[in-house]
């Protein structure tokens, strides 16, 4: 499986609690912070919840 580079590009002010929880689970706390996670269905599900707050790139 590949890897996903997930970058937060919007803040969490006014976000719903489940979106805040998803961001914390992904390991994102600050704007422009990036993390690399494995491309698994559970990570894809977390990204789907916060797709409007992050950008996702595939990394080899």
Swiss-Prot record:
Keywords: Ribonucleoprotein, Ribosomal protein
Family matches, as NCBIfam families: rpmD_bact
Gene that produces this protein: rpmD
MF annotations from Gene Ontology: structural constituent of ribosome
HAMAP family: Ribosomal_uL30_B
InterPro entries: Ribo_uL30_ferredoxin-like_sf, Ribosomal_uL30_bac-type, Ribosomal_uL30_CS, Ribosomal_uL30_ferredoxin-like
Assembly and interaction partners: Part of the 50S ribosomal subunit.
Protein name: Large ribosomal subunit protein uL30
PROSITE patterns xref list: RIBOSOMAL_L30
UniProt-listed PANTHER family: LARGE RIBOSOMAL SUBUNIT PROTEIN UL30M, MITOCHONDRIAL RIBOSOMAL PROTEIN L30
């Amino acid at each position: 499986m590949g890897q996903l580079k997930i970058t937060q590009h919007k803040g969490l002010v006014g976000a719903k609690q489940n979106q805040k929880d998803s961001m914390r689970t992904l390991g994102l706390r600050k704007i422009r912070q990036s993390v690399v996670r494995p491309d698994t269905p559970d990570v894809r599900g977390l990204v789907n919840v916060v797709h409007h707050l992050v950008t996702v790139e595939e990394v080899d």
